[in-house]
Amino acid sequence: KRLRFQVEKVLQMSMLGNEMDGGWQLGHKEAKEYAFLADQASKAMKLTDDSIETVICGSSNDHMKTFGKWEDTCLDIAYDSVDYISLHQYYDNKLGDTQSFLAKSMAMDEFIKTVICICDSVKGRKHSKHTVNLSFDEWNVWFHSNDDEVEKWSTAPHQLEDVYTFEDALLVGLMLITLL
């Protein structure tokens, strides 16, 4: 495809893990341990190709006990070697409160602003000319209403499937506007 569309260079991006502060993740780490590993991995990749962009894991979401401190610790160690920090957020309406549910796009906006402040704080502390940007790479309306046990070794089991409503679509639209 690259040749067909006459693209000179392919954008290369590497995620340096996923939700590493989450105990459910294989390879879960404490912030310092993860940040040192991510810093070294990012530097090694960029030695082979300096156009590679790397994404350090932010906290799994803003409700984690690690949120804020995780971002600060990771960026304090790896700020100048990474290009992005990841953000993840999923919302549900378990309470059936439409007004509060639709207002979650405002919470998403605050989440973004908080991570920007942390990035700017670390940049200032380090007197860095480099800017770490945001990679909001996981977000949606998602709830586990159909989170039934799946029989082991079954063929094409239904997993993590939900029925979404117009209300859910409205929040997704508001979240898209927030991202813009």
Predicted stretch roles:
Residues 1-15, 20-24, 28-32, 44, ...:
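A conserved hydrophobic secondary-structure block that centers on an alpha-helix together
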Residues 30-178:
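Noncatalytic carbohydrate-binding groove/subsite architecture in carbohydrate-active enzymes
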